[in-house]
Amino acid sequence: MTLAAAAGASAAAVPSHLQTFLGLDFGTKRTGVAFASRMLGSARPLSTVRTSQSDARLAQVRVHVQEWQPEALVVGIPFHPDGAEHENTLRARKFARSLRGRFSMPVFEVDERYSTTEARSEGARDADASAACIILEQFLRGLA
């Protein structure tokens, strides 16, 4: 799915049979993980994967996929405030592509500007997992 479609995800863009999602707030050293249910319309932070190694990060994501059995993955894609791409935009997209190659489920990309900032401003104990939760909640709102 393209970013433009994901940013304003609609029921038409995301098939209604997809009900559960694992959200990922990608970072080069930490990746936040959260789970959401379309039926409940809510998300919950799970944990943060702490590694800078791509294979180790993907292995930890696999553990979460096996445990939570999501029907799709949602990856936050960072942008500058003006919408311009930067180095981490490309890294997050590469991460999303690697997820598509490893897991037999849809992977959606969502504009995640300010999610970590919002999580920190809310006093989250685990800002990365909370940012993943915010990304999923934004995604779910787009489906309504």
Where are these regions (language model features)?
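Phosphate- and other anionic-substrate recognition elements at nucleic-acid/protein interfaces
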Residues: M1-L24, T28-A144
